[in-house]
Amino acid sequence: GNKFAMQALEKGCAYAVVDDSSFLTPHSSLILVDNVLDTLQQLARYHREQLDIPFVGITGTNGKTTTKELVATVLSKKYRVHYTQGNFNNHIGVPLTLLSIKPDCEIAVVEMGASHPGDIEELVNVAVPNFGLITNVGKAHLQGFGSFEGVKKTKGELYDYLQEHSGTVFLNVDNPDLFKMVDDRPGINPITYGVKHQEVEVLPVTAHDPYLRIKIGGVVVNTHLVG
């Protein structure tokens, strides 16, 4: 990316950050740092810490992007919501998502992906979520994690962060892996959902009414989602 710094300035950027001194010129708008990626993440965390609003972190083996879109859509009916665009969910996409949050935002929904152990730990320390949701933990894409246990440990880094910071998780109690992961981490505040023994109940669908319905505190919410 260093080689494109001058091109970016010529196209109107106010400043360009580089981490290779050989690209420096007398141009006063070039800023030299030790590591551009680290600087991006540090700037993103600083910006996030200026925002006293709820941050929802979402990860999981499958369904991250769909879940993020659904959560953001529902919340936007009442709040000004900023959320990850597309699947910008990695070590570059998450900081860019945070840096694009405007001061009038009321809730942020941040998708976080992982392909290796430690990825989620890195991202939560940038995004600083106070709410979290793991959609599931599966055996897809095992190559980067080494084993299913590696997947659970990596996704569980979101729970680890929320445990350490007294955060809240939205927990599918019908998923035994997720249930145990939360149960093994005392101090997390879970809000449960599922088809039984939960605070938010997913109601059965029928052939003549195949749309997803949920029950919250005695109130039934009808959706246009096919269950």
Located regions from the model:
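Phosphate-binding loop of NTP-binding sites
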Residues: 32, 38-173, 177-186, 217
